[in-house]
Amino acid sequence: MLDFSLHGEKGKKEDKIQGLTPKERKVRFSENHTGQAVEERIKEYDMKKTDKAIEMVKYAIKCGVRFDYLLIDSWFTNAAFVKRITSRHIKCNPVGMIKLGKTRYQTPYGELTAKEIIRKLHKLGLCKHNATLKCTYCTIDVKYAVTTVRLFFCKRGRNGQWNGLLTTDMKLSFLKAYKVYSMRWATE
């Protein structure tokens, strides 16, 4: 294993931050860990997850690990993260699931959400069927986070749910993107 991080969140109950009473929280870090690795782990516990993910990518590169694609979950596939990865001297392309929410992408058809893009591409007859994966898919290049990205949308079966993938590799085909991202599912 190269690196890992453990993060805490405040939670929803204000009287039990992180699910702990004030007494339990106080006892948790009672020893002095100055100058030890434990001190670093305590600091990163409250650190923003996207910031830590960037640090981990930099650390992997520093350790000599080379990779073409950075596989990311939909939680990390946001404008700030994509912008950071593409603006750095990190020579890799993120491939990540996207949420089909309210995020708007600049398309040739105007600013549209993922669901609106799917409807538009379906209406224009730009969705294709992939016999290998037995799914319907469509591809579009859009502007997102001040950079051009390629979006792939796919669904299995007639009543299947649409899923979205985002990448900055403009040469990537749908089949290759699916196979690359499926490596992430295999490791989970």
Put a short name on every predicted segment.
Residues R104-Q106, S173-K176:
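Short acidic/glycine-rich loop or secondary-structure boundary segments that cap or lie
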Residues M1-G19:
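Structured nucleic-acid-interacting core domains from mobile-element enzymes and related host factors
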Residues W75, K171-L172:
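Short, surface-exposed acidic/glycine-rich loop or hinge patches that mediate macromolecular interfaces
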Residues N163:
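Short acidic-hydrophobic catalytic motif
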Residues K176-E188:
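Short amphipathic alpha-helical "interface-anchor" segments enriched in bulky aromatics
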Residues I17-N159:
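An internal, acidic/charged active-site-proximal segment
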Residues S5, I98, D169:
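Residues at the C-termini of beta-strands that transition into short coil/loop
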